[in-house]
């Protein structure tokens, strides 16, 4: 029994040491043409960039996303299958040492609402912005 507790504690410490520390983990439920706005901030050097996104069409299990990031427009399609459900975007490309990738994951579509998940590792954080 003592060995089980000891190995359990070692396992928990291992998970804590190597676990992912998300600075951004936000679930979004958006209706068609509903706009989500936020400011993405790098806490290590206080840089900020704006993100605006909305979806316009859901057909054949594909969701058409329109996004504006750092005043640059993007349009892409995300699908519900695992291979094509994520769009990754470099946030601060000028910082080579930082792992500053913002991920938008398409989770589900029910009752005319798309469920998306916005993820990024620390030191990135976000604050919502009024549309």
Regions found by a protein language model. Give the residues of each.
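Generic cytosolic/nucleocytoplasmic N-terminal low-complexity/intrinsically disordered segments
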Residues: 1-2, 15, 106
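Sec-dependent signal peptide recognition
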Residues: 2-10
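Hydrophobic h-region of N-terminal signal peptides that target proteins for export
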Residues: 10-19
């Amino acid at each position: 029994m003592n060995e089980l507790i000891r190995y359990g504690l070692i396992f928990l410490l291992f998970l804590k040491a190597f676990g992912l520390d998300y600075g951004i983990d936000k679930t979004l439920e958006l209706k068609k043409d509903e706009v989500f706005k936020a400011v993405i901030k790098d806490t290590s050097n206080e840089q900020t960039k704006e993100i605006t996104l909305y979806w316009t069409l859901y057909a054949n299990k594909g969701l058409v996303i329109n996004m504006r990031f750092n005043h640059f427009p993007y349009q892409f399609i995300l699908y519900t299958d695992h291979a094509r459900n994520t769009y990754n975007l470099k946030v601060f490309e000028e910082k080579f040492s930082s792992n500053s990738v913002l991920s938008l994951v398409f989770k589900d579509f029910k009752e005319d609402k798309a469920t998306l998940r916005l993820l990024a590792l620390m030191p990135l954080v976000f604050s919502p912005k009024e549309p």
